[in-house]
Structure formats: C-alpha cells, structure tokens
UniProtKB/Swiss-Prot annotation:
Subunit structure: Homodimer.
Record has Repressor as a keyword: no
Keywords, sorted A to Z: Aminoacyl-tRNA synthetase, ATP-binding, Cytoplasm, Ligase, Nucleotide-binding, Protein biosynthesis
Gene Ontology CC annotation, any one: cytoplasm
Gene that this sequence comes from: hisS
Protein name, per record: Histidine--tRNA ligase
Localization: Cytoplasm
Length: 420
C-alpha cells in the first residue's frame, strides 16, 4: 500500500488514458493556432489582488474557491483559478497592446479551485483558453466561438450545444441591475443570497439550487433591456455565427460565474456529463483592461475544460488519440542480441519510428506479452541464431505473419512495413 496519496480532487492521467488527454488538448490548441493565435505561458500563481479585481470579489471563485496563501515575503498570492486575468495582466505589463491589434493568444495548463470534488469538478483542472484583446468587433466574437466549435468537431463530438446570450454594456447594465434588484427584494431569499443580490444581483441568477431557480422563473432578462448598440452587436454575432455554419441556441438566462463579462456570453454544454454539463465557456470583456491598469481596450475569449472534454468524448464512446505507446517492440533473446537491438531501436527513433525494447532479460513468451500490451504493430525479434544469420524476425502482431529482415537494413524495413 502506498505511503502517500494524491491530494483529494486532483485527477492523474497515465497510459493509455493520458494519450487521449494529450490528444484532446492538442486538438483544441491546433484549432486556435489555425486562427492565428500564439501561445503564452503564464505563472501558476499571481498577486491575489489581480483575481479579486479582475474576476470580482463577489464571485464564488474569489470568495470561496481560491487557493490563497502568504509567501515568505508576506505577499498574498493565489494559485490561478482562471486564465483571462493573467493574460490581460501580461498584455499590459509587456506592452503587447502597443503593437498589432487584436492581440491573439492561447494558453493551456493547470488551474486551481477549492471545490467539492466530484466527477468533472476538480480542485486542479486542466484548461485551454484563447484571448483576443484590442478590437470590439462582433465578427471576432464569432471567430472565438467558432474556434472552440471546430476543436470539438475535430474530436468527433456531436452531443454538445452552444448556448448564447448578451449581458449588455455599460449603457444598459445599470438600469437592468436596478430592475433585477427590485425583483429580488420581493423574493423570500435566504440571508446570504439577499446580501449577494445587493452586492451583485447578476450573481443570484447564477445560483444552481432548484429552489432558487424556481423563484427566478419570472426574473427580468438582460436581453429584453439591451441598449441599441449592445443589441446590434449581439445580432451581428448571431449573423456571423450563422455565416460560419456554427449552430447555437439562445439562452437568455445564461450567466457566467465571472464578473468581467459584457455583451456576448456563451457556454458549451454536453448533456452526457450529468450535473457538470458545462465543458467550456467564455465571452466578451470590455472593461477588464482598464480595470487592471491598461488601455480602454476590449477583449473576448474562452476557457475550455480539457478534463471535461475528455469525459464528454468518453461519454460518446469516442476513441481519441493513439493508444499505442510505440510502433515496433524490439525483443532481444540474449545479451548480444540486446546490444544490437538497443542500437537498432535508437536508429528507429532517429528515423521517426516509435520503438521500445523488452528490457530485463524476459523470456520470449513474457516479452511478446509486453509487445501486445504496448499496442505496437510489429515486434522485431532477435535470437542467437538470427544474430549469426545477420537478420531479425519482423512479426505483424495483428496477423501473426513474420518474415526475416537484414539487421543492416532493419530500420528501412520497419519504416517500409509501417507505411499505409
């Protein structure tokens, strides 16, 4: 029994599932790269104030879910709970907004939230996100949504939907906020929810409790109170999405859990995951740059849960990624054979072929079991007689057929055999 266990609520990926995990992340990243987004590597922790100001102090993320601690210098730092605030801080700090706009970046990695662990909801979650900063253009909003849609489609996912709405702008939000507060004050809400309604009423709309959802059935909707500009922006986003062939469903009750969102807001939902149906989401944020000390530039982006996307693929029975660890499994029988096959394996790897070796002096039977487990297409077997003859046996592990190949030409022979 292990002396140590992984921290609660943190998934670990190892073969063969890790191959699927990597394939999901790379497929989503490739969709971003195809649209001209460059990679940015962000710190795992930041100044706590960055998230308090950027994400919003009244959000559950900041008030309940952040991993915050004082470092040895007495500074309050927080393990990153999301990526947009960090990307925005980096854009400002490094002057990226002084060049060509929009600044188009994507990121991936681990994020941290102290939540009650359950399927699809982890304390360390893997996410891939994109941010486009510097241009307020409905077509850019549509592009961002289309990038995620393309990534999901290339994975083979079909059971998801895109929910879309608008959260308005600085012109219409204040009057809507007042109407919503007036409505909420007339409801029999618990004390904590009442406080939230006074501090930030939109947060109440994000409440997932069934009893609260029932009370909110007749709440005023933001889409019914949009300014002329916000409504026109929203209509253009929908037009561009339709032009791109991206299907969506309007959900006027959609509210994201982060305060910086304005105008376009969206979520990717997969019903095969039960309660944790959201596999990604995002939106436009017009005031975040200025809030963090930068220029008054708008941005739009998303964060996609890699863990949840993998669960969605599994729920649909999709075989994602190459589960094989190698293409050819080298089986030496004896020390002299091992010395020669280790050299050949090195040559194969140099030629772009994934090659493994049965180390540890295994018997032929034991080594061939290892070959089967590796997922390799071929085994390259070398015994003492083969070595004397200057050839090895190349065995097709699917059909069982085998043939001798000259040791001096083994790399070329394996490469040829692997051709479609």
């Amino acid at each position: 029994m292990s002396t140590f266990n992984a921290p609660k609520g943190i998934p670990e990926y190892f073969p063969p599932e890790s191959a699927a995990f990597l394939a999901v992340r790379e497929t989503l990243a490739d969709a971003a790269r195809r649209a001209g987004y460059g990679y940015i590597e962000l710190p795992l922790f930041e100044d706590t104030t960055l998230f308090a100001r950027g994400v919003g102090e009244s959000t559950d993320v900041v008030s309940k879910e952040m991993y915050t601690f004082a470092d040895r210098g007495g500074r309050s730092v927080t393990l990153r709970p999301e990526g947009t605030a960090g990307v925005t801080r980096s854009v400002i700090e490094n002057g990226l907004d002084r060049g060509q706009l929009p600044v188009k970046l994507y990121y991936s990695g681990a994020f941290f939230r102290y939540e009650r662990p359950q399927a699809g909801r982890y304390r360390q979650l893997q996410q891939l996100g994109v941010e486009a900063i510097g241009v307020d253009d409905p077509a850019l909003d549509a592009e961002v949504i289309a990038i995620a849609d393309e990534g999901y489609r290339r994975l083979g996912l079909t059971g998801y939907r895109i929910e879309l709405t608008s959260l308005g702008d600085e012109t219409c939000r204040p009057s809507y906020r007042a109407k919503l507060q007036e409505f909420l004050r007339g409801l029999p809400l618990d004390e904590d929810t009442r406080k939230r309604a006074e501090l930030n009423p939109l947060r109440v709309l994000d409440d997932k409790r069934p009893e609260v959802r029932e009370l909110l059935a007749d709440a005023p909707l933001m889409v019914d109170h949009l300014s002329v500009e916000a409504k026109e922006h929203y209509e253009q986003v929908k037009t561009h999405l339709s032009d791109l062939g991206v299907a969506f469903t309007e959900n006027p009750r959609l509210v994201r859990g982060l305060d910086y969102y304005t105008k376009t807001t969206f979520e990717f939902v997969h019903d095969g995951l039960g309660a944790q149906s959201g596999i990604g989401g995002g939106g436009r944020y017009d005031g975040l740059m200025a809030e963090l000390g930068g220029q008054e530039l708008s941005g739009v982006g998303f964060g996609l849960g890699v863990d949840r996307t993998l669960l969605a693929c599994q729920a649909e029975g999709l075989a994602v990624g190459d589960q094989a660890r190698c293409d050819v499994y080298c089986v030496p029988l004896g020390e002299a054979a091992k010395r020669r096959l280790v050299t050949i394996a090195g040559g194969l790897r140099g030629a772009g072929v994934r090659a493994d070796v049965a180390y540890g002096g295994k018997s032929l039977k034991g080594a061939m079991k290892g070959a089967d487990r590796s997922g390799a297409r071929f085994a390259l077997v070398l015994g003492e007689r083969d070595l004397e003859a200057g050839s090895a046996q190349l065995k097709d592990l699917a059909s069982g057929e085998q043939r001798p190949v000259p040791l001096d030409d083994a790399v070329a022979a394996v490469r040829e055999a692997l051709q479609p």
